[in-house]
């Protein structure tokens, strides 16, 4: 799409990740989407135009000019959800619990969720949040580099410098919120954000919860809760989400919004669902009209039926399915035989 609609209101992170080229027909710059959220925001603003809450989902491929990390694919296949029109913690809870349930369905037995809140950084930075000087602060927070953070925060108020260093070194389980509530500036926005994190950590349904306010990706458009899920032996998050109120403002309709994206290629590469093969019925025998009709009848009833081809073995089927029944011919027709 033309970049003026593809990137509007999304911040420099997405701009830097977007492949761009010149349209020879118009001379305008075209980009290939690196994220699907801006497109969803435009759909909510212009195509749907609902006054109430909109719940949307999507799946598709994106293209990154720069990979998210050295081992990442530059063509991630993603799926996700967006909830527009609700600003309360209840909407955040709906999205986070859905994220946890999604990963459980995909076969991840122990879900570890990492929670942050962008309102804290926004409250500390104030109007500086859109300045170039903040890039160094954000980079240092991401790297958890106290020396680089001190250099980047030169000129900031001493209270802000101390608060940033506190965020950098204070992360872990939910108990660290006690320290942050006590030692961070007593601004109402900061204390409210810490309370939200505590409540969401309690109700999101994850097996393990940690708190880290240095995960500040997308700080230019994220406005509230942020969360990510990591799994063992994988370097990057397989799911990211958060709140980004006002993402549709550039399309003429500012709406509160939250959602998440799950990176399917990462999960497929780890074969996390391999131990959860679906159950199936196996049907064998030469071509016959009555046999094919019975196979179709079982499929219409909701059964997965694998019609064995010549030379195909049961062992081949077991790589994808758990065979629980076999369709066998009897003197009275067909019946399902348990295996």
Model-derived regions: residue spans:
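Short terminal or interdomain "cap/linker" segment that borders an active site or interface and mediates
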Residues: 118-153
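Glycine-rich loop at the start of a catalytic domain that most often binds anionic cofactors/ligands
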Residues: 4-21
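Short acidic, glycine-rich loop/turn motifs
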Residues: 21-25, 231-233
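Short, conserved phosphate-binding/catalytic loop or strand-edge motifs used
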Residues: 75-79, 115-123
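Hydrophobic alpha-helical transmembrane segments in multi-pass integral membrane proteins
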Residues: 29-36
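A conserved hydrophobic position in a structured secondary element of the catalytic/binding core
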Residues: 32, 116, 262
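Positively charged, Gly/Ser-enriched RNA/tRNA-binding surfaces
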Residues: 2-3, 16, 37-50, 56-108, ...
């Amino acid at each position: 799409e033309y970049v003026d609609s593809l990137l509007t209101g999304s911040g420099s992170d997405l701009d830097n990740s977007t492949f761009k080229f010149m349209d020879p027909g118009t001379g305008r710059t075209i980009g290939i989407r690196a994220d699907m959220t801006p497109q969803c925001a435009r759909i909510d603003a212009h195509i749907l135009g609902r006054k109430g809450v909109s719940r949307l989902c999507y799946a598709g491929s994106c293209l990154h000019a720069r990979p998210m990390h050295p081992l990442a694919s530059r063509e991630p296949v993603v799926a996700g959800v967006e909830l527009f029109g609700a600003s309360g913690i209840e909407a955040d809870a709906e999205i986070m619990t859905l994220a946890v349930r999604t990963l459980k369905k995909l076969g991840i037995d122990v879900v570890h969720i990492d929670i942050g809140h962008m309102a804290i950084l926004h409250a500390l930075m104030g109007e500086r949040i859109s300045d170039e000087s903040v890039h160094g602060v954000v980079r240092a927070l991401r790297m958890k580099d106290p020396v680089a953070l001190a250099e980047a925060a030169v000129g900031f108020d001493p209270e802000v410098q101390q608060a940033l260093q506190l965020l950098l070194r204070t992360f872990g389980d939910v108990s660290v919120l006690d320290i942050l509530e006590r030692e961070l500036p007593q601004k109402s926005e900061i204390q409210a954000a810490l309370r939200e994190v505590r409540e969401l950590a309690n109700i999101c349904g994850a097996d393990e919860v940690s708190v880290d306010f240095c995960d500040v990706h997308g700080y230019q458009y994220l406005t509230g809760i942020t969360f990510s899920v990591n799994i063992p032996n994988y370097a990057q998050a397989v799911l990211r989400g958060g709140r980004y109120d006002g993402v549709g403002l550039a399309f003429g309709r500012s709406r509160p919004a939250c959602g998440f994206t799950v990176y399917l290629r990462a999960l497929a590469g780890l074969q996390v669902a391999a131990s959860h093969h679906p159950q199936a019925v196996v049907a064998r025998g030469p071509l016959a009209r009555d046999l094919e009709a019975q196979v179709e009848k079982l499929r219409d009833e909701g059964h997965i039926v694998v019609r064995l081809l010549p030379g195909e073995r049961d062992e081949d089927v077991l790589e994808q399915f758990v065979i629980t029944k076999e369709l066998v011919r009897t003197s009275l027709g067909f019946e399902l035989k348990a295996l």
